[in-house]
Regions:
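Long, low-complexity, intrinsically disordered polar/charged segments
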Residues: 26-45
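Short small-residue beta-strand/loop micro-motif enriched in glycine and branched aliphatics
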Residues: 1-5, 66-68, 92-95
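Surface-exposed charge patches
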Residues: 25, 56, 60, 115
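Hydrophobic beta-strand scaffold residues
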Residues: 34, 64-65
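RNase H-like two-metal-ion nuclease catalytic core shared by retroviral integrases
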Residues: 39-41, 45, 51-58, 65-89, ...
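C-terminal domain-tail junction helix/linker
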Residues: 61-63, 85-143
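Distinct, well-ordered alpha-helical segments
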Residues: 19, 50-51
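Active-site beta-loop-alpha junctions of metal-dependent nucleic acid enzymes
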Residues: 4-31
Protein backbone atom coordinates (compact mmCIF):
# COMPACT_ATOMS: atom_id res chain seq x y z
CA UNK A 1 0.00 0.00 0.00
CA UNK A 2 1.27 3.45 -0.90
CA UNK A 3 0.69 6.41 1.40
CA UNK A 4 1.73 9.94 0.45
CA UNK A 5 1.36 13.38 1.92
CA UNK A 6 2.98 16.46 0.44
CA UNK A 7 5.12 18.78 2.57
CA UNK A 8 7.19 21.86 1.85
CA UNK A 9 9.99 20.58 4.10
CA UNK A 10 11.75 17.25 4.55
CA UNK A 11 12.03 17.00 8.33
CA UNK A 12 11.62 14.44 11.11
CA UNK A 13 8.35 16.07 12.18
CA UNK A 14 6.87 15.83 8.67
CA UNK A 15 7.94 12.16 8.46
CA UNK A 16 6.25 11.49 11.82
CA UNK A 17 3.17 13.43 10.68
CA UNK A 18 2.80 11.17 7.63
CA UNK A 19 2.77 8.12 9.89
CA UNK A 20 0.35 9.75 12.33
CA UNK A 21 -2.01 11.19 9.72
CA UNK A 22 -2.05 8.49 7.04
CA UNK A 23 -0.12 5.29 7.69
CA UNK A 24 -1.06 4.24 11.24
CA UNK A 25 -4.78 5.13 10.87
CA UNK A 26 -4.98 3.06 7.67
CA UNK A 27 -3.42 -0.06 9.18
CA UNK A 28 -5.45 0.39 12.36
CA UNK A 29 -8.63 0.47 10.24
CA UNK A 30 -7.52 -2.87 8.78
CA UNK A 31 -6.96 -4.36 12.23
CA UNK A 32 -3.22 -4.57 11.62
CA UNK A 33 -0.67 -3.26 14.12
CA UNK A 34 2.35 -1.38 12.82
CA UNK A 35 5.20 -3.35 14.38
CA UNK A 36 8.12 -2.35 12.18
CA UNK A 37 8.96 0.20 9.52
CA UNK A 38 11.76 0.18 6.95
CA UNK A 39 13.28 3.52 5.89
CA UNK A 40 16.44 4.74 4.28
CA UNK A 41 19.07 6.47 6.40
CA UNK A 42 17.93 10.03 5.67
CA UNK A 43 18.19 12.63 8.43
CA UNK A 44 14.39 12.88 8.52
CA UNK A 45 14.29 9.25 9.74
CA UNK A 46 17.47 8.77 11.77
CA UNK A 47 18.83 10.35 14.93
CA UNK A 48 18.99 9.93 18.71
CA UNK A 49 15.59 8.94 20.09
CA UNK A 50 15.57 11.61 22.80
CA UNK A 51 16.39 14.40 20.29
CA UNK A 52 14.71 13.28 17.07
CA UNK A 53 10.97 13.71 16.44
CA UNK A 54 10.61 10.72 14.09
CA UNK A 55 12.58 8.36 16.34
CA UNK A 56 10.61 9.59 19.35
CA UNK A 57 7.31 9.02 17.52
CA UNK A 58 8.36 5.44 16.71
CA UNK A 59 9.40 4.82 20.32
CA UNK A 60 6.13 6.20 21.73
CA UNK A 61 4.15 3.97 19.34
CA UNK A 62 6.36 0.93 19.98
CA UNK A 63 7.37 0.61 16.31
CA UNK A 64 10.69 -1.04 15.53
CA UNK A 65 12.81 0.92 13.03
CA UNK A 66 14.81 -0.98 10.42
CA UNK A 67 17.09 1.01 8.13
CA UNK A 68 18.23 0.08 4.63
CA UNK A 69 21.88 -0.56 3.90
CA UNK A 70 23.86 2.59 3.20
CA UNK A 71 24.24 2.65 -0.57
CA UNK A 72 22.43 0.07 -2.72
CA UNK A 73 18.87 1.18 -3.61
CA UNK A 74 17.98 -2.50 -4.25
CA UNK A 75 17.61 -2.96 -0.48
CA UNK A 76 14.31 -1.10 -0.73
CA UNK A 77 13.40 -2.08 -4.29
CA UNK A 78 9.64 -1.82 -3.82
CA UNK A 79 9.94 1.77 -2.67
CA UNK A 80 12.39 2.63 -5.47
CA UNK A 81 9.96 1.15 -8.01
CA UNK A 82 7.12 3.20 -6.52
CA UNK A 83 9.21 6.38 -6.87
CA UNK A 84 9.64 5.64 -10.58
CA UNK A 85 5.94 4.83 -11.02
CA UNK A 86 4.69 7.96 -9.25
CA UNK A 87 7.09 10.10 -11.28
CA UNK A 88 6.06 8.56 -14.62
CA UNK A 89 2.35 8.00 -14.02
CA UNK A 90 1.43 10.92 -11.78
CA UNK A 91 3.84 13.86 -11.64
CA UNK A 92 4.99 13.95 -15.28
CA UNK A 93 1.41 13.54 -16.53
CA UNK A 94 -0.19 15.89 -14.01
CA UNK A 95 2.26 18.76 -14.43
CA UNK A 96 1.78 18.66 -18.21
CA UNK A 97 -1.99 19.04 -17.79
CA UNK A 98 -2.36 21.51 -14.94
CA UNK A 99 -0.71 24.39 -13.08
CA UNK A 100 -1.11 24.26 -9.31
CA UNK A 101 -1.48 27.37 -7.19
CA UNK A 102 -1.43 25.54 -3.87
CA UNK A 103 -0.33 22.31 -2.25
CA UNK A 104 -3.86 21.31 -1.19
CA UNK A 105 -5.08 21.02 -4.79
CA UNK A 106 -2.04 18.95 -5.76
CA UNK A 107 -2.58 16.76 -2.66
CA UNK A 108 -6.20 16.20 -3.68
CA UNK A 109 -5.14 15.04 -7.15
CA UNK A 110 -2.42 12.86 -5.62
CA UNK A 111 -4.96 11.27 -3.26
CA UNK A 112 -7.18 10.45 -6.24
CA UNK A 113 -4.24 8.88 -8.09
CA UNK A 114 -3.23 6.91 -4.96
CA UNK A 115 -6.75 5.50 -4.64
CA UNK A 116 -6.44 4.23 -8.23
CA UNK A 117 -2.89 2.94 -7.61
CA UNK A 118 -3.84 1.05 -4.44
CA UNK A 119 -7.31 -0.21 -5.40
CA UNK A 120 -7.57 -0.51 -9.19
CA UNK A 121 -4.12 -0.71 -10.81
CA UNK A 122 -2.79 -4.30 -11.04
CA UNK A 123 0.85 -4.76 -10.03
CA UNK A 124 3.41 -7.25 -11.25
CA UNK A 125 6.07 -8.92 -9.16
CA UNK A 126 6.41 -11.94 -6.93
CA UNK A 127 4.28 -10.48 -4.11
CA UNK A 128 1.43 -9.06 -6.19
CA UNK A 129 1.06 -11.41 -9.18
CA UNK A 130 -1.29 -9.05 -11.02
CA UNK A 131 -3.31 -8.05 -7.96
CA UNK A 132 -3.79 -4.52 -6.64
CA UNK A 133 -1.98 -3.56 -3.43
CA UNK A 134 -5.30 -3.70 -1.55
CA UNK A 135 -6.05 -7.19 -2.89
CA UNK A 136 -2.55 -8.29 -1.89
CA UNK A 137 -3.06 -6.89 1.61
CA UNK A 138 -6.47 -8.49 2.05
CA UNK A 139 -5.23 -11.84 0.73
CA UNK A 140 -2.32 -11.64 3.19
CA UNK A 141 -4.71 -11.03 6.08
CA UNK A 142 -6.53 -14.28 5.27
CA UNK A 143 -3.38 -16.38 5.63
Amino acid sequence: MAHCKLYVTKTPISAADLLNDRVLPFYSSQGLPMLRILTDRGTEFCGKVEQHDYQLYLAINDIEHTKTKAMPPQTNGTCERFHKTILNEFYQVTFRKKLYGDLDTLQSDLDEWLAHYNNERPHEGKMSNGRTPMETLLDGKRI
